[in-house]
UniProtKB/Swiss-Prot annotation:
HAMAP family: DapA
Stretch forming the signal peptide: none
Predominant cellular place of this UniProt entry's protein: cytoplasm
Active site: Y133 (proton donor/acceptor), K161 (schiff-base intermediate with substrate)
UniProt KW keywords: Amino-acid biosynthesis, Cytoplasm, Diaminopimelate biosynthesis, Lyase, Lysine biosynthesis, Schiff base
Pathway involvement of the protein, from the record: Amino-acid biosynthesis; L-lysine biosynthesis via DAP pathway; (S)-tetrahydrodipicolinate from L-aspartate: step 3/4
Gene Ontology annotations of biological process type: diaminopimelate biosynthetic process; lysine biosynthetic process via diaminopimelate
Protein name per UniProt: 4-hydroxy-tetrahydrodipicolinate synthase
Function description: Catalyzes the condensation of (S)-aspartate-beta-semialdehyde [(S)-ASA] and pyruvate to 4-hydroxy-tetrahydrodipicolinate (HTPA).
Record-stated family: Belongs to the DapA family.
GO molecular function: 4-hydroxy-tetrahydrodipicolinate synthase activity
Reaction catalyzed: L-aspartate 4-semialdehyde + pyruvate = (2S,4S)-4-hydroxy-2,3,4,5-tetrahydrodipicolinate + H2O + H(+)
Length: 292
């Protein structure tokens, strides 16, 4: 089981929107040096909706190849077509990812039984360990705790990223989940509490900007050191909040560009961060001790 701070890494792009693989490789090196515990490639923060299937597969391949075992790479493979989700998962397994993260199918609004059948079909088609991803604020469909725990009975479904932000739901999951089933927070603002209550880590947006601090906060929480986790988190609250002042990943890509880590490329329909938000993101970065 991977524990701690797993970054939902941004996808570097040139100003014209083309993929920037040299910057991706340097970002991976930086996360290794900063202590990040794992990488999710081509997730929501990695702009998965606007990359082609070929680009999606190439991003997975390059990330796994360049990480070269120095840091675990989890491949984002979600789709609202079960057949496409299976195809992406098969490629992730072939490329050598340690696991894959599959989001609740969006837009077509399946029932709980439809969600169960979708994820079961993916898990049965591919041996690669599968982490469920519930983010109802984006998908509309909401994977209930009961359905998630039913899916947890399938051997290669190994965990869940819970991005509901609900501590009540997290407590229920932590209490009822089988031993060895990994629970990750997908809500940076509640990560410390989530782990202190018994969660195993986070798949984080903030870790793109403050990877060492996120690693240290998670490590403290996993060790049961609530005071240390709280102290570190206090410096990061501004980032947790203002990296979502516009739709993710717009603010976080602006922040990592300010840090000199990537160019400013985004793909439509995403547009650059509105100037009115620049100061609040910069202030949050400085509060976290980040020079930009």
């Amino acid at each position: 089981m991977i524990t701690g701070s797993i970054v939902a890494i941004v996808t570097p792009m040139h100003e014209d929107g083309s993929l920037d693989f040299p910057r991706l490789r340097s970002l991976i090196d930086w996360h290794v040096a900063e202590g990040t515990d794992g990488i999710v490639i081509v997730g929501t923060t990695g702009e998965s909706p606007t990359v082609s299937v070929d680009e999606h597969c190439e991003l997975i391949r390059v990330a796994v190849e360049h990480a070269a075992g120095r840091i675990p790479v989890i491949a984002g493979t979600g789709a609202n077509s079960t057949a496409e989700a299976i195809a992406l998962a098969r490629y992730a397994q072939q490329a050598g990812a340690v696991a894959h993260l599959s989001v609740v199918p969006y837009y077509n609004r399946p029932s709980q039984e439809g969600l169960y059948q979708h994820f079961r079909s993916v898990a049965e088609a591919v041996e690669l360990p599968l982490i469920l991803y519930n983010v109802p604020g984006r998908t509309v469909a909401d994977l209930s705790n009961d359905t998630a725990l039913r899916l947890a009975e399938i051997p290669n479904i190994i965990g869940l990223k819970d991005a509901t932000g609900s501590i009540d739901r997290a407590c229920d999951l932590i209490e009822r989940a089988p031993e060895g089933f990994a629970l990750y927070s997908g809500d940076d603002m509640t990560v410390a509490a989530f782990i202190l209550l018994g969660g195993h880590g986070t798949i984080s947006v903030t870790a793109n900007v403050a990877p060492r601090a996120m690693h240290e906060m998670c490590a403290a929480a996993l060790a049961g050191d609530a005071a240390k986790a709280r102290t570190i988190n206090a410096r990061l609250v501004g980032l947790h909040r203002h990296l979502f002042c516009e739709a993710n990943p717009i603010p976080v890509k602006w922040a990592v560009q300010r840090m000199g880590l990537v160019e400013g490329g985004l793909r439509l329909p995403l547009t650059p961060l509105a100037e009115s938000f620049h100061d609040r993101v910069l202030t949050a970065m400085r509060q976290a001790g980040i020079q930009a």
